[in-house]
């Protein structure tokens, strides 16, 4: 963890903090490259290969979600606003030792993410439930991934419509519909389980 070594908040709160300071620190560079510009090329590949929360959740036994996707994705917007308001309030109230608070927010925030993620995975029997419904970072990733250069597409000449791709997808993406307009087209994490 670079954040622990550098004592810097690498989560979304750290991005807001350094952005408001006008500082080009590791968190702002990380978000700019991996989560704002990166999805234009790799979609949500970050989620499938580099996200530390997703990596821990993938160790759980619920790799193939059994249930349909719930309609509670609005929670990610609430989490996004909470992270933004948390940092704004630190500036408004001129909190002392803000660097120390941001570092502890990084540690505590990660623990909370893991606890919520593991609890949701067990409750919904779905490793990636946190990613689908709670993760505020997807607010950055989803719009850019809509225009992603790298996409998994269905070869309709070989497809026999067995739906194995859908049944193996941890994000419930319907790969039969490979148009950019598919409802869940920005959800693909390029895990390649469908291939």
PLM regions and their residue ranges:
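Structured cytosolic domains appended to multi-pass membrane proteins
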Residues: 175-195
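Non-ligating segments of multi-cofactor redox enzymes
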Residues: 1-177, 186
């Amino acid at each position: 963890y670079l954040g622990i070594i550098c004592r810097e908040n690498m989560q979304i709160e750290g991005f807001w903090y350094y952005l408001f300071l006008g500082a080009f620190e590791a968190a702002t560079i990380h978000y700019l490259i991996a989560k704002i510009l990166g999805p234009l090329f790799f979609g949500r590949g970050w989620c499938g290969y580099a996200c530390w929360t997703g990596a821990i959740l993938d160790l759980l036994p619920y790799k193939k979600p059994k249930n349909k996707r719930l309609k509670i994705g609005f929670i990610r917007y609430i989490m996004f606003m909470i992270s933004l308001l948390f940092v704004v309030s630190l500036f408004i109230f001129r909190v002392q030792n803000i660097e120390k608070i941001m570092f502890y927010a990084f540690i505590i925030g990660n623990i909370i993410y893991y606890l919520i993620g593991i609890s949701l995975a067990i409750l919904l029997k779905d490793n990636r439930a946190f990613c689908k419904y709670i993760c505020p970072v997807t607010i950055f990733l989803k719009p850019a991934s809509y225009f992603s250069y790298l996409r998994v597409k269905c070869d309709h000449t070989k497809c026999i419509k067995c739906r194995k791709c859908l049944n193996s997808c941890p994000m419930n993406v319907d790969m039969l519909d490979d148009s950019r307009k598919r409802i869940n087209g920005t959800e693909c994490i390029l895990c390649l389980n469908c291939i």
